[in-house]
Curated annotation (Swiss-Prot):
Belongs to the aconitase/IPM isomerase family. LeuC type 1 subfamily. GO terms for molecular function: 3-isopropylmalate dehydratase activity; 4 iron, 4 sulfur cluster binding; metal ion binding. Its cofactor is [4Fe-4S] cluster. Heterodimer of LeuC and LeuD. One of its GO terms (biological process) is L-leucine biosynthetic process. [4Fe-4S] cluster binds at C349, C409, C412. It catalyses: (2R,3S)-3-isopropylmalate = (2S)-2-isopropylmalate. It comes from Nitrobacter winogradskyi (strain ATCC 25391 / DSM 10237 / CIP 104748 / NCIMB 11846 / Nb-255). Its EC number is 4.2.1.33. InterPro entries: 3-IsopropMal_deHydase_lsu, Acnase/IPM_dHydase_lsu_aba_1/3, Acoase/IPM_deHydtase_lsu_aba, Aconitase_4Fe-4S_BS, Aconitase_4Fe-4S_dom, IPM_dehydratase_rel_enz, IPMI_cat. This is 3-isopropylmalate dehydratase large subunit. Signal peptide: none annotated.
Amino acid sequence: MSQPTTLYDKIWNDHLVHEAEDGTCLIYIDRHLVHEVTSPQAFEGLRVAGRKVHAPEKTLAVVDHNVPTTDRSKPNPDPESAEQIAALAQNARDFGIEYYNEFDKRQGIVHVIGPEQGFTLPGTTIVCGDSHTSTHGAFGALAHGIGTSEVEHVLATQTLIQKKAKNMRAVVDGKLPDGVTAKDIILAIIGEIGTAGGTGYVLEYAGEAIRALSMEGRMTVCNMSIEGGARAGLIAPDETAYEFLKGRPKAPKGADWDAALRYWETLRSDDGAHFDHEIRLDAAKLPPIVTWGTSPEDVIAVTGKVPDPAAIEDEAKRLSKERALHYMGLLPGTKITDIRLDRVFIGSCTNGRIEDLRAAAKIAEGRTVNGNVSAMVVPGSGLVKEQAEAEGLDKIFTRAGFEWREPGCSMCLAMNPDKLKPDERCASTSNRNFEGRQGFKGRTHLVSPSMAAAAAIAGHFVDIREWR
């Protein structure tokens, strides 16, 4: 009888090409997603070496990081961004790669469009020159970010050199209370393990609460695996995943679908499989969460108060948290609901999908954005935007005073025109609250879409569970 195996081990073993004596492995890569920021040097390396892209049909390119989310008929105001976008278009033509430019309705954030097109499939290995590639693990794919030199290696060989990670599992049982979402689950997990807690691991999410999530919710959870230090996040595929993928443009069809389904149904951790580390959370006890500092591990219930670092015994950690409070312009003991806001951003590869926009629109409908707040909604892709407009969500947002934008990474990161000004405070549905992440001296609080929408209307954080 074979030894029980984890989901990660199964996918890894299916893609292992060679293992050296020191544990260094060569694994086959099924899918490669490419964007404009981390690919120019990789393509130039191929040119210099006289190499072709090994498997262009397994490579998909899209612009997302640098594209403006306003009127795209006008020239890009940033020459460097415009150059990177033009370079990706040229590289896609030269190397025969499918490419979604900024005028293609299929364009969007790379981690939104992959699943949307059915390019992301269970049991595959997926890489991209972007740390949030872990998003695709929601489908039971082994997906993680790579560096630019590795982008070139995958383009040239369709393989990747790395060492195998350890197995970790986060089990979330129970039922989420009303107003508590997938975003709160992953923030709670990161708060529990810290931003280094998953280092050296691939993190599988399991349990009743995870199973109850939609695919959008599962993508939110897996998206932030890297914020917990993990190389990748995984959720075993099930009927929810199959239903999402069936009929997608790049998903298998007919007999190929039936064959794929038979394989996908084997993709789960066996009973008794060994995990090197495991944590457990009770979903029923989770509150809506807000980050207060400059690390995703700096989490607090919306009903809580900004903590006092003086109670931290470890000097390095205490100094780090004191610096975070100074940067954020907050005092210990401040009620989270007393924190007033300047900006609200709803979007990103964490929370820019149709379910996220519906949740925010439900809060915004019939209400008005606070006069002291500038709020924007940025769909994760052109197809999400199209669906939202078909449902009238854009009208709900614009009537309430939100800006309705074109798809892209937008204010998640300060690499395009959507940026915070110094000392502006933002409630954001994105994934990182680092110093300067959304703009020089910008102050970021991570929250769910419904929490962000409510904060935009109130002008400060509110407990969404009490929203009327």
